[in-house]
Amino acid sequence: MKRTMLYLSLLAVSCSVSAAKYPVLTESSPEKAGFNVERLNQMDRWISQQVDAGYPGVNLLIIKDNQIVYRKAWGAAKKYDGSVLMEQPVKATTGTLYDLASNTKMYATNFALQKLMSEGKLHPDDRIAKYIPGFADSPNDTIKGKNTLRISDLLHHSGGFPADPQYPNKAVAGALYSQDKGQTLEMIKRTPLEYQPGSKHIYSDVDYMLLGFIVESVIGQPLDRYVEESIYRPLGLTHTVFNPLLKGFKPQQIAATELNGNTRDGVIHFPNIRTSTLWGQVHDEKAFYSMGGVSGHAGLFSNTGDIAVLMQTMLNGGGYGDVQLFSAETVKMFTTSSKEDATFGLGWRVNGNATMTPTFGTLASPQTYGHTGWTGTVTVIDPVNHMAIVMLSNKPHSPVADPQKNPNMFESGQLPIATYGWVVDQVYAALKQK
């Protein structure tokens, strides 16, 4: 009921308020923003050491009080060709595009949902079946609940779906196998629930794949076209896209990821699997093979400058410059902790307890929210300190440490920088040690 009343409030605001003038980002220096420069220099040297130790490439940007106060790139956008180190790596620059992985959930799908809910086109308590015909329990389902599943259940990752059905891998997915977007929706409808909806939180890509389909059902166009034309373009963003190679970008502008396609250095095989270095295509298997590169859970590419504008839009309460995407009430609704688990908002992860230290560190305010991405991306938005941090990297662009033991552990993932919270803590420590 509380969520519903808040929704009605935000809808009333969105209907009565015309486009407002919101703060826009300007450039400043760490000193003027109150940061201890030597502490930031120590962080800089440490990141350089991590790159020297094998971490591929990193971009870091810091916002404080509506100003970009720090922006830097380290390492390589591409340094491997297959498993062979390149003699002349492609350097990472502050403009390099990175595969955002699960940060797509926030900066594409959540932004779309926040906008549509502000416009009254969606409600968090709407049932999924309202937008996805045929989404229902079947007589043979052991666990039922699809008939009453709501949008908010998916946003809370409490919808009952498994974490990763691996639809494109026939040997794993079995009868749910799909490498076609239309067929994938049918497979999602058939995917058995693993627990009673609302009884727990299990982070699942399926939740956001389904939310992406819901957005497309409401707007009547592909998700990528909607967010690029209705969200990013009005904000002046030109480097935030799905399928960048199909939209005018060159590989040299983009950070590469896995060395040998999706094979984890040769131990994984399924129909049509990519085997050469991934450069400009989404790494995520479900997004690439099952969804054509455009999905609600993964597929978005961006750089730190564009992400900075999107984070500032959240700090501003839903707008940027003369553009209002959604209301402050919408932001509050989406970033308020769930009663069942303080670390989950509506999609956004919240700094609700110590389990979020690997993401938010130990110094961010409890109201801080953001998200991570499997490729090595993290965004941190702190409304109390009016600060935001984005770190983009291409963590999978390194050999797998032991493909037989753990095909998902890359050598770079064993380095301390792969725990984002350490970098986040250094930023906060620099602010507190003026």
Functional labels for PLM-detected ranges:
Residues T4-V13:
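Sec-dependent N-terminal signal peptides
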Residues P23, K78, P139-P366:
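Short, surface-exposed loop or secondary-structure junction motifs
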Residues S28-Y98, K121, V400-M409:
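Short, conserved catalytic-motif segment at the N-terminal edge
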Residues N41, I47-S48, N66, Y98-I128, ...:
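Active-site SXXK
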Residues H123-D141, R233-L235:
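Short, glycine/proline-biased beta-turn/loop segments that scaffold the active-site neighborhood
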Residues N316, E329-T330, K339-E340, N353-T357, ...:
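Short, gly/Ser/Thr-rich active-site loops of penicillin-recognizing serine hydrolases
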Residues T368, T375-A388:
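Short, surface-exposed beta-strand/loop micro-motifs that present aromatic residues
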